[in-house]
Amino acid sequence: MSTNARSTEMTKPDERYDVVVIGGGAAGLSAALILGRSRRRTLVVDAGEPRNAPAAHMHGVLSRDGMSPAAYLEAGRREIAEYGVEWRAGRVTGAAPDGRGGFAVTLADGTAVGARRLVVTTGLVDELPKLDGVAERWGRDVLHCPYCHGWEVRDRAFGVIAHPMMPAHQALMVSNWSKDVTLFLHTADGLSAHDAALLDAAGVTVVAGEVAGLVVEDDRLTGVRLSDGRVVAREVVFVGADRLVPGDGVLRRLGAALRETPFGEFVTVDETGRTSVPGVWAAGNVTGPQEQVVNAVGLGYRAGVAVNNELLLGDLEDAVAGRPRG
């Protein structure tokens, strides 16, 4: 992968940064950008696993609508390099207090760096339903977000595979982009009378029965196959993940507080992204599943500002008290 960002080929174990950003997606690069502009020595460690990688294009990002996720991140890496931020391909396997008010950060290749503060932006993984064709077509004609992809597939024949927790929700959402929507109840227990009325008002057709998989012909989705053998012709399928798995291993090992959400456990943060662990911030989809690229950028920016402010004021307080800088 080419990038103009200055990559560290081999970081010395005793090398210390003001901030290590763990994760190089939209939130991480945004935090790194403001930290670099704040003259903070910053390292971004990026495992290269963005949630939106399967998509050919991203949408709803002002001035970048239609840009590929890979090109967007490449542009971000070029920008952070202008401010001296270092970028490194790698995976952080752990972080622990270093006894100096900061953290020792270990990487999978055995190297280690020090950080006065951490910003964790490691995103999440969508665990998709185990149905034939879903994973293979994900991000192409199997989609989850109409705001991200609805315009590009408008007026086609939509199928929606119901999520057991909210069986009608996604079908109602996508009905604004097509008048030909079929909801497959799949494993959902059924519909409430209210949901059934809403679906009827939206013109959504409801099909009972468990989905077995998708029908793909000539590299094109053509239908949804039910377990009883029926095939319903469809051109696009919307489906939610069975489970959302945040990349929060480092945060959990540090003892960060978690909160329960309808989508599972996520790290608890304040409005700036500060976690319950002193010196550790988190931003982007690792903090919640509904952070689109534009939201992630804002959250990363906010975390970067908060980290810089804490370092600045902390250093001044130490200077006044005659303490060595942390």
Spell out what each predicted region is:
Residues 32-33, 168-172, 283-326:
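A conserved FAD-binding loop/helix module that cradles the flavin
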Residues 17-71, 157, 162-189:
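Beta1-alpha1 glycine-rich phosphate/pyrophosphate-binding loop at the start
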Residues 7-8, 130, 136-152, 243-294, ...:
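FAD-site-proximal beta/loop scaffold in flavoenzymes
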Residues 37, 41, 47-49, 56-83, ...:
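N-terminal glycine-rich dinucleotide-binding loop that anchors FAD/FMN and/or NAD(P) in oxidoreductases
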Residues 31, 54, 97, 129-131, ...:
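Short glycine-/acidic-enriched loop or helix-start segments at secondary-structure transitions
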Residues 5, 74-107, 112-115, 178-265, ...:
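A Rossmann-like FAD-binding core segment of flavoenzymes
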Residues 2-17, 87-156, 240, 263, ...:
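FAD-binding core/adjacent interface of flavoenzyme oxidoreductases
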